[in-house]
Amino acid sequence: MLAFTLRFIKNKRYFAILAGALVIIAGLASQHAWSGNGLPQINGKALAALAKQHPVVVLFRHAERCDRSDNTCLSDSTGITVNGAQDARALGKAFSADIQNYNLYSSNTVRTIQSATWFSAGRSLTADKKMMDCGSGIYASINTLLKKSQNKNIVIFTHNHCLTYIAKNKRGVKFDPDYLNALVMYAENGKLFLDGEFVPG
């Protein structure tokens, strides 16, 4: 009887520990959403909070490509579709509600330039061909843009293979971005860190 009682008490103790751990995990989950790919999700409000701590770098994949869609082209066949332009404009409006102060960059392709232009509704844009080079050298290129921007927030329109590389290299996760998906980064002492995936809303 004594042995049974001791086992029961021990089991109750383990149960209490387990229940407490589950409560803690549930509390953390309520504060931080995670994408199915393993990246933390960062919405507009969270991005604005991060931007108060340090300049943020938001890297977007361009909008829907014309040459891979049956939808109507905006203009040039190497650019984006009309739908893609409208999606970029809507995203830009939502983004600017939380982040008004940023410098805008893109790679030097028609599709990224058009995406950035529609996203920003005419904000000054700098095209940089180095945003096409998506290996380890991309970090030096981003740091160069940060210095040019005097450590302001920066938005960069680039390509899916760049985002895939960064997610794998920085967090070891597989990220296959859709059109206009984005990653959020920041720099500290010249080193870039990946905060997570930007999710509007």
Curated annotation (Swiss-Prot):
InterPro entries: His_PPase_superfam, LipoPS_heptP_Pase. One of its GO terms (biological process) is lipopolysaccharide metabolic process. Its main location: periplasm. Residues 1-33 form the signal peptide. Gene3D superfamilies: Phosphoglycerate mutase-like. Keywords: Hydrolase, Periplasm, Signal. Its EC number is 3.1.3.-. This is Lipopolysaccharide core heptose(II)-phosphate phosphatase. It comes from Salmonella typhi.
